[in-house]
């Protein structure tokens, strides 16, 4: 469980300490910084897995990543607090406008050896272009002679995923053929949805059947997926399906955008726990869904959060109506910087006797709406 995150100097986030729960629902006006918070997880995952320089280059350099650019911000830092361990890092600007590590550390307590550990991941260097966590895992394993405890921090950092199912165009990855064995995990854009569903159908039939039932609730015309290897010999598979009462096989392009997104969401949130990321992060999952499907989505999010940590950003009042006040994290802009606030539940008791939570958001009782 990622309990707390402290970010300084990233995009619109000047300095914020954010407490997270098993299910965290971000709400806020356009431009408040929800997407920047989501993108921070992408940044950190890339930096931990040795792709920092590529990520910075693709994002437009440090100028596009630091709070108000290079003139306003010279360094960025993060501290992540997990249950039993923590990680911190500081980044400064290179001469060519990228970022590099000037501090990186991991901290925790090994239960089996009854002793804390506190290590610098820079080793003997004063800085480095990529994370040193892999190097230190090797050293840590040598010191403690115990595989498992050594990878705790990296596992916590690298196994989360940010999902974004917005692209349902004809050229979207989820509508294209995919290698039949590309199924280790569901891709961020569901580009391997067909091969992943095929894996579940063959090896986790109960979970596969739950996904099919979920899709039928949102789309009563849906019968089942048709998941078969390309009949013309290539080792690929594509998403196909059948309608109730018909033998005709339809391609994914025959599904509405909302139905296709709901298929992706159901697959993500109803897959076996052992295949799930440690943290599931979804940007605006309600896009294109009708009101009943949004209600179903809320149930899926709650179910998934009983297994793994879930972070969601949303603009949907009907979706927010399905959650508790303690689930919400209100994102706003104050003095040109993004701030994050939890609700004071004691102040909302009377309001909640008369209104749903989303309605209070719409009325700007709990904040998170545009302000002058």
What are these regions (language model features)?
Residues 83-218, 226:
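Electropositive, glycine-dotted interaction segments
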Residues 1-14:
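N-terminal pre-Walker A segment at the start of P-loop NTPase domains
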Residues 21-59, 189, 262-268, 316:
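Phosphate-binding glycine-rich loops of NTP-binding sites
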Residues 236-238, 243-247, 251-282, 292-294:
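GG-anchored amphipathic helix commonly corresponding to the ABC/SMC/Rad50 NBD signature/C-loop
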Residues 1, 295-372:
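C-terminal lobe/lid and adjacent interdomain/linker elements of RecA-like ASCE P-loop ATPase modules
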Residues 39-100:
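Conserved P-loop NTP-binding catalytic core
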Residues 15-21, 272-275:
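Phosphate-binding P-loop
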């Amino acid at each position: 469980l990622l309990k707390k995150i402290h970010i300084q100097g990233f995009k619109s986030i000047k300095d914020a300490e954010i407490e997270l729960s098993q299910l965290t629902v971000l709400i806020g006006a356009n431009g408040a910084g929800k997407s920047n918070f989501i993108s921070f997880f992408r940044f950190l995952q890339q930096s931990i897995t040795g792709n920092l320089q590529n990520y910075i280059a693709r994002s437009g350099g440090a100028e596009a990543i630091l709070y108000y650019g290079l003139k306003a911000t010279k360094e960025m830092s993060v501290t992540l607090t997990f249950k039993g361990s923590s990680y911190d890092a500081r980044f400064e600007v290179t001469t060519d406008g990228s970022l590099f590590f000037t501090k990186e550390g991991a901290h925790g307590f090994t239960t089996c050896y009854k002793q804390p550990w506190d290590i610098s991941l820079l080793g003997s260097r004063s800085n480095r272009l990529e994370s040193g966590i892999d190097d230190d895992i090797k050293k840590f394993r040598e010191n403690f002679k115990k595989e498992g405890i050594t990878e705790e921090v990296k596992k916590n950092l690298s196994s989360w995923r940010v999902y974004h199912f917005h692209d349902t165009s004809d050229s979207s990855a989820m509508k294209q053929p995919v290698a039949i064995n590309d199924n280790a995990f569901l891709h961020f854009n569901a580009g391997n949805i067909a091969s992943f569903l095929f894996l579940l159908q063959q090896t986790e039939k109960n979970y596969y059947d739950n996904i099919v039932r979920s899709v039928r609730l949102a789309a009563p015309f849906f019968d089942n997926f048709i998941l078969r290897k390309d009949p013309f010999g290539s080792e690929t598979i594509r998403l196909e399906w059948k309608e109730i009462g018909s033998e005709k096989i339809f391609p994914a392009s025959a599904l509405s955008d909302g139905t296709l997104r709901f298929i992706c969401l159901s697959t993500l949130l109803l897959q076996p726990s052992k295949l799930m990321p440690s943290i599931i992060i979804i940007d605006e999952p309600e896009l294109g869904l009708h009101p009943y499907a949004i209600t179903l989505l809320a149930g899926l999010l709650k179910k998934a959060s009983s297994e793994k940590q879930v972070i969601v950003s949303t603009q949907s009042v009907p979706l927010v109506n399905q959650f508790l006040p303690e689930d919400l994290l209100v994102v706003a802009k104050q003095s040109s910087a993004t701030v994050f606030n939890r609700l004071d539940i004691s102040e909302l008791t009377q309001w909640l006797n008369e209104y749903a939570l989303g309605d209070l958001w719409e009325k700007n009782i709990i904040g998170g709406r545009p302000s002058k």
